[in-house]
Amino acid sequence: MIVQDSVCSELMRGCEEILPVPELEKKLQKGIPLKIKAGFDPTAPDLHLGHTVLLNKLRQFQQFGHEVIFLIGDFTAMIGDPTGKNVTRMPLSQETVLENAKTYQHQVFKILDPDKTTVAFNSQWLNKFNAVDLIRLAATHTVARMLERDDFNKRYTTGQPIAIHEFLYPLLQGYDSVALKADVELGGTDQKFNLLMGRELQKHYGFEPQVVMMTPLIEGLDGVKKMSKSLDNYIGINETPEQMFGKIMSVSDELMWRYIDLLSFKTGKEIQQLKQSVLEGKNPRDVKIDFAKEIVARFHDQTQAEFAHNKFIERFQKGNIPEDLEELSLVIAEPIALAQLLKQIDLTASTSESIRMVKQGAVKVDGDKISDPSLKLPIGKSYIIQVGKRRIAKLSIQQAD
């Protein structure tokens, strides 16, 4: 019983909410492998560390002998998950969905054990649905129940349109749990309504309801908004070792602990020991370096993690400019404002970000901190431009004919 209690405690660690906890404990105490399901709609080709919070939890279940079902929602992706959206999402083509799904499989096996993972596609059963099946599924829930979901409710009360097919999405996702006979389903906190729909439909179809385990949405590099490619505050798992290492080293010490808690493969006990060592005088930077190496090694290898570490020391801690820095060329008719220039050479994602970075004192030209975003660099010269700790470019500005 002590062993089972420690397993249960480790599996629950890092979860935002578990519904219901007693049922999870009861299922684990049976001592038989459980079916652990997690669904992913392949609506974008690349994953970032935010996605791996859930994948890490799946990996834990594998380590304790349970069966992990990595469900690719190729059918539902062609509908588009309306969760958190204030407008109807455009459906994707089957070709795009299948191409993204292939990329997903390659990426997730950097974390999951392929020999202990069943990859399923919900088109396997949803493609067999006929009109009668769909109507019967729709009849299990009311419009009033659907409007309990925050995003639907907001759109309804503000007069924004809700397409009928959007109501079908949570029902179809829930039916996946029926088809797979899932014991546990994992998902982000933003998926709560859809996850609970799986429980309700399993009860309706006469199955033991799944336990729902929700993992938190991890903050991006800014420490405020959730990690997202669209907000440019993410660490992609396909990024180069140097990019990964530099981004992790750029986060605050407070955010570092959040990342370690949710992303490290260390046990809860080991993490507590790390925190205690910092309280006793260990430099948090050293903990961050070890964590950065752990993440880089996971998605690349240990040799590249050490190489990225050495490059980081050379570039940032010693203040050196890399010798192999590629020179960019910008041909313009007349000088342009620095804020616009930074965006043009992809050191920032937008002019507004450029302005913000300059005002924060994060932009240097040839080692000098710049305070004026409207500064115009003379044409006919080369410059070393730095934005923050990890974005750097050698730029030659040339006169257009």
UniProtKB/Swiss-Prot annotation:
The keyword Transferase does not apply. It is found in: Cytoplasm. A motif ('HIGH' region) lies at residues 42-51. Belongs to the class-I aminoacyl-tRNA synthetase family. TyrS type 2 subfamily. The gene is tyrS. GO terms for cellular component: cytosol. Disulfide bonds: none annotated. Catalyzes the attachment of tyrosine to tRNA(Tyr) in a two-step reaction: tyrosine is first activated by ATP to form Tyr-AMP and then transferred to the acceptor end of tRNA(Tyr). GO terms for molecular function: ATP binding; RNA binding; tyrosine-tRNA ligase activity. A motif ('KMSKS' region) lies at residues 226-230. The lineage of its organism: Bacteria, Pseudomonadati, Pseudomonadota, Gammaproteobacteria, Legionellales. Its EC number is 6.1.1.1. It comes from the Bacteria. Keywords: Aminoacyl-tRNA synthetase, ATP-binding, Cytoplasm, Ligase, Nucleotide-binding, Protein biosynthesis, RNA-binding. InterPro entries: aa-tRNA-synth_I_CS, aa-tRNA-synth_Ic, Rossmann-like_a/b/a_fold, S4_RNA-bd, S4_RNA-bd_sf, Tyr-tRNA-ligase, Tyr-tRNA-ligase_bac-type, Tyr-tRNA-ligase_bac_2. ATP binds at residue 229. GO terms for biological process: tyrosyl-tRNA aminoacylation. It catalyses: tRNA(Tyr) + L-tyrosine + ATP = L-tyrosyl-tRNA(Tyr) + AMP + diphosphate + H(+). Homodimer. It is an enzyme of class 6 (ligase). This is Tyrosine--tRNA ligase. Residues 336-397 form the S4 RNA-binding domain. Gene3D superfamilies: HUPs (3.40.50.620), RNA-binding S4 domain (3.10.290.10), Tyrosyl-Transfer RNA Synthetase (1.10.240.10). The keyword Nucleotide-binding applies.
